[in-house]
Amino acid sequence: MNLLIMGLPGAGKGTQAAKIVEEFGVIHISTGDMFRAAMANQTEMGLLAKSYIDKGDLVPDEVTNGIVKERLSQDDIKEKGFLLDGYPRTIDQAHALDATLADLGLKLNGVVNIDVDPNSLVERLSGRIIHKKTGETFHKIFNPPAGDYDENDYYQREDDKPETVKRRLDVNIAQGQPIIDHYRKSGIVHDIQGNQEISEVFVDIKKVIESLA
């Protein structure tokens, strides 16, 4: 079973990816892990990626695509299947993935798209506050400080401010939507309602994956 999981930041993609791996035994392939492994193992593409990262440059698509191809060509993938997480990030990378899978004789069976209203994500992602003295982290809605607290005792990181979060989500939507549209043409996208309990989201995902087996 070869799968791709997609969803906006805060949609619970990481949580659900871990559950899928545990339940179905597929290999979890996240971009960060892939890069770290390729660099640690000093593969051709890993060394190339390191040369860009060490200079503080962005790693070009062709190197990222090469690292993905190196990983997908390993034996455990053919045995167990994979769950791609965090790649492809752009439509160009999606086309490169299509070519890679064709070269390796692999097929993408399904795209799990966790669909969450972006406005609710702004609320979810911009609620984090940090106590100025202790550095303790809280969430205005999901994990507020005890009792009546004084907002002046807390601060927000720039990354967590609503306008920054909204910009980040807008970028993700602009990049992600063409990828979803691309795979929708093949009829392999399965939209999962993400505005429900974690366990309920996974029940829906499990049904989809079992239907593909």
Curated annotation (Swiss-Prot):
Residues 127-160 are annotated as: LID. This is Adenylate kinase. CDD domains: ADK. Its EC number is 2.7.4.3. Belongs to the adenylate kinase family. Coiled coil: none annotated. It is an enzyme of class 2 (transferase). Consists of three domains, a large central CORE domain and two small peripheral domains, NMPbind and LID, which undergo movements during catalysis. The LID domain closes over the site of phosphoryl transfer upon ATP binding. Assembling and dissambling the active center during each catalytic cycle provides an effective means to prevent ATP hydrolysis. One of its GO terms (molecular function) is ATP binding. AMP binds at T31, R36, D57, L58, V59, G86, Y87, P88, R89, Q93, R157, R168.
